[in-house]
A protein has these predicted regions:
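Cysteine-nucleophile active-site neighborhood
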Residues: 301-375
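Beta-strand->loop->alpha-helix junctions that form or flank phosphate-binding loops
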Residues: 41-42, 176-184, 275-283
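A short, charged/proline- and glycine-enriched loop
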Residues: 3-6, 243-249
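A short helix->loop->beta-strand "cap" motif at the edges of active sites that frequently abuts
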Residues: 117, 174, 323-327
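C-terminal and late-domain segments of enzyme folds
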Residues: 112, 217-218, 244-246, 258-268, ...
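ATP-dependent carboxylate-amine ligase catalytic core
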Residues: 2-21, 27-115, 119, 123-147, ...
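Phosphate-binding active sites in nucleotide-utilizing proteins
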Residues: 246-323
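Internal gly/pro-rich beta-alpha loop/helix module
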Residues: 129-242
Length: 451
């Protein structure tokens, strides 16, 4: 299958160079200008797509080269951008930064190569003159097929930009697409897992509007759209997805404590016949009625542990449901919620042991899980690409999977049973289609269990 898909990848020279701010400014400016735009994020990050969604009013896809083969990457990109004027893809870390310090595997560069996407590089030019060009020279010559077609200078001044732009275009033949000056009043706060979530930024809309207004003055949006339209059509074989059976109802925990979900994973469950019913472990007293499954995603339960403990009614409701065999997927924060306690605050108590602050990132990054037993989602021996990103650890993290990092380091993790997956690793259902099918099928069995 071949699909036209105008697209543009916003990459950065390094983490902290301003690519998220620049991406958000561009998205908001395009939306305000009447351009129909889609958004995507390289890698497994949950938070940046939340900002994209707030701006464009639609989901943002994760394009993860560790999770997906070429067909899936291109399918998700084409599906998300269908009918849009352009898709703006935000990179992750520095352009060439991948797994390990000496590899570009799973990098933004790899996404650009595998999706044939033209790239605009964000370069932090604060306090720099000719040195900014030296940095650009390095990026342009590090890889022959670098796909860099334009540059945006972040932190640049209106006085410096014309000279630097002229030098960039004359020396390198890439397009200078504008600049974004320092705007400290529009900065986005961070915490240990990156930016704070979009829902926690009280004045997010105002900040985005200020960024967009400035971008309309200083960034050549027409040039960006021209670069996006230069992207070749996407060629791929779409996955075979069909709903096989009657619909089921899956409760999905969605509030400030549980907000880490891949929107494409949720969309896949819907395509397989699931109705997703949101509920809040923070504020609801009980689970929704007539559920056939439960999905507890990640998030920040440790920040809301006192409130989660105080809601004893829904903790009891969830414990009773899981213990009676309601099919349940609980990732990271959802897994923590099923343990006995978080930092001394009582949780659902389905699983033994408590969770504690490890004081540093724990088992951070990509890993491949190998199932050690047959379970609801996975057959023994199946391998699953996964990701961990957390500072909190558990006394009993489970041992039903062997996790192995690309470096070779390995450990046992997670719980897997006939009706349960619970563990720190996150995975994407589009990287594990059979797991999504099995989850929905388990929910169908639950639906008929009491008939």
């Amino acid at each position: 299958m071949q699909k036209a898909a105008p697209r543009l990848l916003i990459a950065g020279t390094n983490s902290g160079c301003g690519k998220t701010t620049v991406t958000c400014a561009i998205l908001q400016a395009l939306v305000d200008g009447g351009v129909s735009v889609a958004a995507a994020k390289c890698g497994p990050d949950y938070i940046d797509p939340m900002f994209h969604r707030e701006i464009i009013g639609a989901k943002s896809s994760n394009l993860d080269p560790f999770f997906f083969d070429d067909d899936t990457l291109r399918f998700l990109l084409a599906q998300n951008g269908a009918g849009k004027d352009a898709t703006v893809i935000e990179g992750v870390m520095g352009y060439y930064d991948g797994i390990g310090l000496d590899s570009s595997r799973a990098s933004t560069f790899e996404v650009a190569q595998r999706t044939e996407s033209p790239v605009v590089l964000v370069l932090n030019a604060k306090g720099a003159g000719l040195s900014a060009l030296a940095v650009l020279d390095g990026f342009l010559h590090f890889a022959t097929e670098n796909r860099i077609r334009g540059v945006i200078l972040n932190g640049c001044t209106a006085m410096s930009y014309p000279t630097l732009a002229r030098a960039i275009e004359e020396r390198f033949g890439v397009r200078a697409c504008g600049f974004l000056p320092q705007m400290p009043d529009c900065s986005l706060e961070s915490r240990h897992l990156g930016l704070i979530t979009a829902a926690e930024v009280d004045d997010l809309k105002e900040k985005m509007q200020r960024l967009a207004a400035k971008a309309q003055e200083t960034i050549d949006l027409d040039a960006l759209l021209q670069i996006a339209k230069s992207a070749p059509p996407l060629t791929f074989t779409p996955p075979d997805i069909s709903a096989a059976g009657e619909h089921v109802r899956i409760g999905v925990a969605r509030d400030r404590a549980f907000c880490f979900y891949y929107e494409d994973s949720l969309e896949l469950l819907r395509r397989l016949g699931a109705e997703l019913v949101p509920f809040s472990p923070l504020s609801d007293e009980r689970l929704p009625e007539d559920l056939h499954g439960l999905y507890l995603g990640g998030g920040y339960p440790e920040l809301y542990a006192e409130r989660l403990e105080a809601n004893a009614a829904i903790r009891a409701s969830i414990r009773a449901a899981v213990e009676r065999g309601l099919p349940c997927v609980a990732e990271c924060g959802g897994f923590m919620y099923l343990t006995q306690s978080i930092a001394g605050h009582a949780m659902a108590g389905v699983l033994s042991g408590s969770c504690f602050d490890a004081g540093k990132l724990t088992r951070f990054g990509y890993a491949t899980l190998t199932a050690q037993r047959d379970s609801m989602l996975f057959a023994a021996g199946e391998q699953i690409p996964a990701h961990e990103f957390h500072r909190w650890d558990a006394e009993n993290p489970g041992e039903d999977f062997l996790a192995e990092k690309p470096s070779g380091r390995s450990w046992r993790c997670a719980y897997a049973g006939e009706t349960l997956y619970a563990g720190y690793p996150h995975f994407h259902f589009y990287a594990n289609l059979s797991a999504a099918v099995r989850f929905v099928e388990a929910c169908r069995k639950e639906k008929h269990r009491y008939e």
